[in-house]
């Protein structure tokens, strides 16, 4: 075995950095300085361990080619091997005499005996696996085995290569010959299978079913013989060595240094490639830190690189998360003081671990039957009992396998969630005894603010419940009022007016106090919408009841936007209809746009159940065989009945409505309904009515799409206008006669109300995605890199503009809220999650006002649509001006009404 020799990274320059140590020591003392730099050092060491663990796991699984260390090498070698395979095919095609055993399988994807019997004309139609795919397959298989001592023998590698190519030829024909069927019925299910064995077993069942229906020409696969597989694999190894020099054949050495002629040849990476991969793996391991919270205030941001953490490190933080250093440099000279101030205020907020909640978390996450549904179980759910006649009863076997598959699918997600859960709990325990911790923040390229460490206040309910702000104030009467509102919100009682929320808390005071007194036995709190955040509320509520209104409370209370994307579109367009649906207007009741859409959907469902179309059953003839198979298209009446039986609530429509403002299309809504509602319902036994899941999802997607687009007409108009602008800017303008380029494709640029510049610049990759049936996918070079920027991707520019534009606006609003709340109301503790602003109860009333005041100021002082137009209009060619739709008209929404709306941010 020719293993990688990955040197140990020395991160001592982080822990021993003199300048940051002196600064920290002067301000926070020697111990804090040492601990902070030790944490930053540990972040790199933990990152290194994580990288190497992933590398080891991929090596053991034979997936080394998918590791970041190997991907550039695959990209480099792929065109070289592709050319060598093409050359060999041409050489053999032109050679006289009998073809080698490997020729027909490699050239045409069929066994030699079958190829000879086919005849030349028929054989021409058998294109086989492409040289590009064969090259990728060969590199992935060989790299996957070169590090595994029991798999690196030449015969073993050759055999695996031959089998892999046969599988690609055999099952790849399904994708090629029956593309529509594969995409609709096979692709997603194949991706859900983990491991080659399960994927192949699934595809064998698919193949048999298709052949029984007269598809694939009705022909069974003519298997390659074992020796033929060996010939194919050996030839591919030879071509790999000739074309790339990636591997070499070696034998074990005798004591005198000579080859052991009795041993089998080994396939080993050539020394030059071992060194190359080792260096790259070592470098990557050294720049993959697992960032953690700080035990001193983070380093303030004063420029675009180097804030947050105090040591420089191998990979200093950037203020803006961009795809390249070149993109980051654009921000270097930008004057945006409010942006810097907002991010610094966010990360200068001290937090601490909520020890009371953590004590409960430490116990409850290890219960076999945890009452909190979102806590991933310790063990896999038990498989359904196997039928006694499973070996002889085909119907019973299929039913059992379907139920078992659902268990395995859920368990895959459980394992991933469990790992994240255990990491978060470990981090909370690690920092539990610190009086204060801080979280460095930066932004994505649209200006949305993110915490950097994996453990942070923007996490799930358990993580948020396990953290609280470090600086509190006496809660007072007003703060106690907002604490009650927060408690009701955490319980899911957030779609009713404030008095009803207060009433819910007061009526359940006994349950709240009992939960606080003994949460492990009094588990009423686990039934609430956000159980851990609600438990944190219970402890604080009990504290106020015990100590009175002078109780020092630091629990963060959040004011969330009501479908913020549509709120921003409605405000910028003064749309009173959409604005009312998302609570921008004063009202005695809470407007729930998700329920509004659900109600409209239910109206149509009841109509369709009575007057809808009927199911159609067609006999479809196979184009090649002429055989018929049945196609069932469920009618509206049947689909409506299924959904009425299941029940369409706001939960079904929420994600689809929420993402409309972020550019989702009907096809995405269909996928969301399938993933969020139908598949989970089928898995837990509540979705048995969905006999045709894809049809049910498509039907519901159309109903939701139709309902939401008539509810927020102005938002849809704005999104379409933005797409038109992006499409024109991304278009290349040529002279019709001379074909001279009059205007190149342009990226899009705009500036948010608080001065943050946004560049949307999606470019086409000089690569293509090559996907194998079983061995995954990879980017492969289509052209050699010239060092110049690639062409603007017009499709991505158009589809991305609506979500990116509105995300930039809510990011700006959040930052402006932070600065305004600090400057006007003196608030200095912030809990921020995109469209949610929070602070301690004593300051909550002022933040309630601040978030509304900045929303009004944003759109009173800025016509963001007109400003956007002004920033790109000069870039349009004169021939495009008449193609640009007029700027959307404004409605009659009075922005000042937002100040009086209780529920706009609540």
Curated annotation (Swiss-Prot):
Superkingdom of origin organism: Viruses
Its EC number(s): 2.7.7.6
Annotated catalytic residues: 560, 654, 835
UniProt GO cellular component terms: DNA-directed RNA polymerase complex
Keyword Nucleotidyltransferase appears in the UniProt entry: yes
Enzymatic class: transferase
Keyword check for Nucleotidyltransferase: yes
Signal peptide stretch: none
GO molecular function: DNA binding; DNA-directed RNA polymerase activity
Function field: DNA-dependent RNA polymerase catalyzes the transcription of DNA into RNA using the four ribonucleoside triphosphates as substrates.
Protein name as it appears in the record: DNA-directed RNA polymerase
């Amino acid at each position: 075995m020719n293993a990688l020799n990955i040197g140990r990274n020395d991160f001592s320059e982080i822990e021993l950095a003199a300048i940051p140590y002196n600064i920290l020591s002067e301000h926070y003392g020697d111990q804090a300085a040492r601990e902070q730099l030790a944490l930053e050092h540990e972040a790199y060491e933990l990152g290194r361990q994580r990288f190497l663990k992933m590398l080891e796991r991929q090596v053991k699984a034979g997936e080394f080619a998918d590791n970041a260390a190997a991907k550039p090498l695959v990209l480099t070698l792929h065109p070289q091997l592709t050319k060598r395979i093409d050359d060999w095919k041409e050489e053999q095609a032109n050679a006289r005499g009998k073809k080698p055993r490997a020729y027909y399988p490699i050239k045409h994807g069929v066994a030699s005996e079958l190829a000879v019997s086919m005849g030349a004309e028929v054989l021409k139609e058998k294109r086989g696996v492409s040289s590009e795919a064969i090259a990728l397959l060969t590199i992935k298989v060989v790299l996957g085995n070169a590090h595994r001592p029991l798999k690196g023998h030449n015969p073993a590698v050759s055999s695996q290569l031959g089998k892999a190519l046969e599988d690609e030829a055999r099952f790849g024909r399904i994708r090629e010959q029956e593309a529509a069927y594969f995409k609709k019925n096979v692709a997603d299910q194949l991706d859900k299978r983990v491991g080659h064995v399960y994927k192949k077993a699934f595809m064998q069942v698919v193949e048999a079913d298709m052949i029984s229906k007269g598809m694939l020409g009705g022909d069974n696969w003519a298997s390659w013989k074992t020796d033929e597989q060996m010939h194919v694999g050996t030839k591919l190894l030879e071509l790999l060595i000739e074309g790339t020099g990636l591997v070499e054949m070696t034998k074990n050495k005798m004591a005198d240094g000579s080859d052991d002629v009795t041993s089998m040849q080994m396939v080993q990476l050539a020394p030059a490639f071992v060194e190359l991969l080792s260096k790259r793996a070592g470098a990557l391991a050294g720049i993959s830190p697992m960032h953690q919270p700080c035990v001193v205030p983070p380093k303030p941001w004063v420029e675009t690189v180097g804030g947050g953490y105090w040591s420089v490190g191998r990979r200093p933080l950037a203020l803006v998360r961009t795809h390249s250093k070149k993109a980051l440099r654009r921000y270097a000279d930008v004057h945006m003081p409010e942006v810097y101030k907002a991010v610094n205020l966010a990360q200068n907020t001290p937090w601490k671990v909520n020890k009371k909640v953590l004590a409960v978390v430490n116990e409850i996450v290890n219960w076999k039957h945890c009452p909190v549904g979102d806590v991933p179980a310790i063990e896999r759910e038990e498989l359904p009992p196997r039928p006694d006649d499973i070996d002889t009863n085909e119907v019973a076997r299929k039913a059992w396998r379907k139920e078992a598959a659902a268990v395995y699918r859920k368990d895959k997600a459980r394992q991933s969630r469990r790992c994240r859960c255990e990491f978060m709990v470990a981090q909370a325990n690690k920092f539990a005894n610190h009086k204060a911790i801080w979280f460095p923040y930066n932004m994505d390229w649209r200006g949305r603010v993110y915490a950097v460490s994996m453990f942070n206040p923007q996490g799930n309910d358990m993580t948020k419940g396990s953290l609280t702000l470090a600086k509190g104030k006496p809660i007072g009467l007003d703060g106690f009022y907002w604490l009650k509102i927060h408690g009701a919100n955490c319980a899911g009682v957030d779609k009713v007016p404030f008095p009803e929320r207060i009433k819910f808390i007061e009526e359940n005071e006994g349950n709240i106090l009992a939960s606080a007194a003994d949460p492990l036995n009094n588990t009423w709190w686990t039934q609430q919408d956000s159980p851990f955040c609600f438990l944190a509320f219970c402890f604080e509520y009990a504290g106020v009841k015990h100590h009175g209104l002078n109780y020092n409370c630091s629990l963060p209370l959040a004011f969330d936007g009501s479908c913020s994307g549509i709120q921003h579109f409605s405000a910028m367009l003064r749309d009173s209809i959409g604005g009312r649906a998302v609570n921008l207007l004063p009202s005695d009741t809470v407007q729930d746009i998700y329920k509004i859409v659900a109600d409209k959907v239910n109206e149509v469902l009841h109509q369709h159940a009575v007057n809808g179309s009927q199911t159609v059953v067609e006999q479809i003839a196979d184009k090649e065989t002429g055989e018929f198979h049945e196609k069932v298209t469920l009618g509206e009446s049947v689909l409506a009945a299924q959904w009425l039986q299941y029940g369409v609530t706001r939960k079904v429509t929420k994600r689809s409505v929420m993402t409309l403002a972020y550019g989702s299309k009907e096809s995405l809504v269909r996928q969301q309904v399938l993933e969020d509602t139908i598949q989970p319902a089928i898995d837990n036994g509540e979705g048995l009515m969905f006999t045709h899941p894809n049809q049910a999802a498509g039907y519901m997607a159309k109903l939701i799409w139709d309902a939401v687009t008539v509810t927020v007409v102005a938002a849809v108009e704005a999104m379409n206008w933005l797409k038109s602008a992006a499409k024109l800017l991304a278009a290349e303008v040529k002279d019709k006669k001379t074909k001279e380029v009059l205007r190149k494709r342009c990226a899009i640029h705009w500036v948010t109300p608080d001065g943050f510049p946004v560049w949307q610049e999606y470019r086409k990759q000089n690569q293509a995605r090559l996907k194998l049936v079983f061995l995954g996918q990879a980017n492969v070079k289509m052209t050699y890199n010239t060092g110049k920027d690639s062409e603007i991707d017009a499709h991505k520019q158009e589809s991305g503009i609506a979500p990116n534009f509105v995300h930039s606006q809510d990011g700006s609003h959040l930052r402006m809220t932070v600065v305004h709340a600090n400057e006007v109301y003196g608030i200095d503790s912030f809990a921020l999650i995109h469209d949610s602003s929070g602070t301690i109860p004593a300051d909550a009333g002022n933040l309630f006002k601040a978030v509304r005041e900045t929303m009004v100021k944003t759109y009173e002082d800025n016509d963001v649509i007109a400003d956007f137009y002004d920033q790109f209009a000069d870039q349009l060619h004169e021939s495009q001006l008449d193609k640009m739709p007029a700027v959307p008209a404004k409605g009659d929404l009075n922005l000042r009404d937002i100040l009086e709306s209780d529920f706009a941010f609540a």
